[in-house]
Amino acid sequence: MEKETKSLAWPATAEFYGWVFIFSSIQLCTVVFLTVRFNGFKVGREYAVFTFAGMSFNCFLLPIKMGLLSGHWTLPRDFCAILLYIDDFSAYFSSWSLVFMAIERINYFCYSTPLLNENSKALAKVCFPIVWVVSGVQALQMLNNYKATALQNETGQCFLAFLRSGHDMWLMLVYSVVIPVMLVFFYLYSKNFMLLKDELSSVTTYLCIYLLLGTIAHLPKAALSEIESDKIFYGLRDIFMALPVLKVYYISAMAYCMACDDHTVPVRLCSIWLVNLCKKCFSCTRREKGSDLEVGIKMLK
C-alpha cells in the first residue's frame, strides 16, 4: 500500500517539473540576454556565464526526471547514479560559482583602481578549479550515500534518485547554502570599512535573500524526508521534494544582479516597455470599441 501511495504522487511531481522546465528555460534565456546586453566589460561576466551553465545542467535534466517519474522511461541503477551525480554537481557548482562571483563584486566595489582587471583575472584562474574540485567531491559524497541505500532496496526503479534521505538533504542545505553564505558574509565583514553604505546594504540584501530562498528550497525536503503519513501527505511531501529545483530561478537572478554594473537599468527599461505595451493594447481596445460604435451609428442611419 505504501508503494502504491507513493506511485500515485509521482505524476503530480512530474507535472510540476514540467512547468518548472518551461518557465525556467524562458527565465534563463531572458537573464542571459540581459546580462550580455547590459553588462559592463570590466565586471565578472564569466562568473555569470559559469553560474548559468551550472543551472542549465539542472534545467535540462528536468525532462529526464519527468520521464522517470511518470513511468515512461526506465533506467538501470548505474544510469540513475550518473543522473543523481550530475544533478547534485550542478547545484553545488552553481552555488560556489555564485560565491566567488560575490567575492569578485565585493572587490570591484572596494578597489576602484587600474589593477582591478588583473585581480579579477587572478581570482578567476584560482577559483574555478577550486569550484570544480569542491563540487565534485561534495556530489561524490551524496552519490556514495545513494549507492549504499540502493544496495538495501530490492526494486530496480530509479525512484531512489529522488527519494533522498533526510541526512542527504541536510548535507545539501549546509553545503550549497549555509557554508557559501557564511564565507561571503565573513569576507564582506572583513571588507566592510572599504564599502559605501549603499553598496554594503545591496550586497547584504542579496546574501540574505539567497540564504532565505535556499533555506525555503531545502528545509521542507530535509525535514519531511523521513516522516511517514497518509496518501494526502505523500503528495505534499513529493511537491516539497521538488522545491530545490527552484534554485534555477533565484541563483541565476542573483547572478545577473551581482554581475551587472547597474542592474536597475534593464529592470527600468523592461518596466517602461511593459507599460508602453499595456498602453498600446489599451488604446487599441478603445479604438476598436469606438469604431464598432461608429459602425452601429451608420447602420442605424
Swiss-Prot record:
Location in or out of the cell: Host cell membrane
Segments traversing the membrane: 16-36, 49-69, 83-103, 123-143, 169-189, 200-220, 239-259
Keywords: G-protein coupled receptor, Glycoprotein, Host cell membrane, Host membrane, Membrane, Receptor, Transducer, Transmembrane, Transmembrane helix
Residues annotated as signal peptide: none
CDD domains linked: 7tm_classA_rhodopsin-like (cd00637)
InterPro entries referenced in this protein's UniProt entry, alphabetically: GPCR_Rhodpsn (IPR000276), GPCR_Rhodpsn_7TM (IPR017452)
Main subcellular location of this protein, as a coarse class: host cell
Pfam annotation, one family: 7tm_1
Membrane topology summary: Multi-pass membrane protein
Coiled coil: none
A GO cellular-component term linked to this record: membrane
Extracellular side: 1-15, 70-82, 144-168, 221-238
Glycan attachment residues as annotated in the record: 153
Cytoplasmic side: 37-48, 104-122, 190-199, 260-301
Molecular-function GO terms, alphabetical: G protein-coupled receptor activity
Family membership: Belongs to the G-protein coupled receptor 1 family.
Protein name per the record: G-protein coupled receptor homolog U51
Gene: U51
